Every structure is written in C-alpha cells, then in structure tokens.
C-alpha cells in the first residue's frame, strides 16, 4: 500500500510539474519582432557662405589664437591646417559668390598671412605669431570688404570662448602626423 501511495504521489507531482511548465511556457510572451530601422533622410541642406564661415573658419580662428597663447604649437598648427582646409571646403561648396571666384579670392587675400602665421608657429615665436595673427585677422576683414560684407569685422580674440577645451600643452602627448593633402 505504501508503494501505491508513493506511486500516486509521484504521478500527481509529475502532472503538477508538467502543468506548471506548460503554464509558464504559455504565459511567456513571444519576443517582439525587431523594428525596421528608420529610413535615412537626406536633408535639403544648402549652407550659405555665412553658415560655412561660421562653422569652419571663425571657431578655428579663435582656437588658433587660444592655442598660441598657451604656446601649444602643435594645437596651433592643427588649427591652422584645419582653417586652410575649411577655406578649401568653402570654395568647393560655393565656388562663386556674387560673381566672385572664392578659391582665388581666398588665396589672393589670405595666403601670405596664413604662411606668415605658419612660420611663427613653426619657429614657436609668440611675438611673431601675435603680429602675423593680427595681419591674418586684418586679411579676414579685407576679404569681407571684397565680398561686400565690410560690416562683418573680425578681431583678435580678447578671451577664449571655449570653456570646454584645454588649450595648454599636455606633456608626453605625441601629436598625430599632419593629414595628407587630397
């Protein structure tokens, strides 16, 4: 009799266990199918000359100054290269502005000053940099005048407007090599 009770308990336990497993399996929701990725939307963004100058040149002008003030010549050289590349991108994006070819205009007005700033950076000469940068800034204003925008007046920065960037030299940091020209 004892065996019969034991067998009945085992059968009842097995049925209860099977019922709970089936219940759990039935109550677990099926995984949701993965959502399809949103389609790529290409915006009809047509930046103006002002947009590009504000995005590509003006911040680098200020960062170039800030880096040189900290005698971080590596960062200054980087910012100057980025500024040059910005002028190239602008001329490629907007080749003509009010019937003026921007590429040659940038070269004619800015090139000698950019080279002078580069020389000051290469020689790590703060006094030479200050003078060359003032001339570069004056060239910005000459370019604005040539493009009938004399009301846009650039100046040598008085303060650094980038509170989230440290312009000091970081000891032991090796700068990346200059990017290859395309």
Question: Predicted segments — roles?
Answer:
Residues 31, 35-182:
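Sequence context surrounding c-type heme c attachment/ligation sites in exported
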Residues 26-28:
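Boundary of Sec targeting at the N-terminus
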Residues 15-24:
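C-terminal segment of classical bacterial N-terminal signal peptides
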Residues 11, 17, 39-40:
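Heptad-repeat coiled-coil amphipathic alpha-helices that mediate oligomerization/assembly
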Residues 1-14:
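Bacterial N-terminal signal peptides that target proteins for export
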């Amino acid at each position: 009799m004892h065996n019969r009770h034991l067998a009945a308990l085992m059968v009842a336990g097995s049925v209860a266990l099977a019922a709970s497993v089936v219940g759990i399996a039935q109550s677990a929701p099926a995984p949701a199918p993965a959502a399809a990725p949103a389609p790529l939307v290409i915006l009809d963004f047509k930046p103006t000359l002002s947009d590009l100058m504000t995005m590509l040149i003006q911040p680098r002008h200020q960062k170039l100054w800030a880096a040189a003030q900290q005698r971080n010549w590596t960062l200054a050289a980087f910012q100057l290269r980025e500024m040059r590349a910005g002028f190239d991108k602008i001329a490629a994006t907007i080749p003509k502005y009010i019937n003026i070819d921007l590429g040659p205009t940038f070269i004619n007005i800015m090139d000698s000053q950019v080279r002078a700033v580069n020389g000051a950076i290469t020689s790590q000469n703060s006094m030479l940099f200050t003078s060359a940068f003032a001339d570069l800034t004056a060239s910005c204003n000459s370019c604005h005048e040539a493009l009938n925008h004399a009301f846009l007046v650039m100046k040598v920065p008085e303060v650094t407007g980038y509170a989230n960037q440290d312009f000091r030299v970081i000891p032991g940091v090796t700068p990346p090599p200059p990017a290859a020209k395309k």
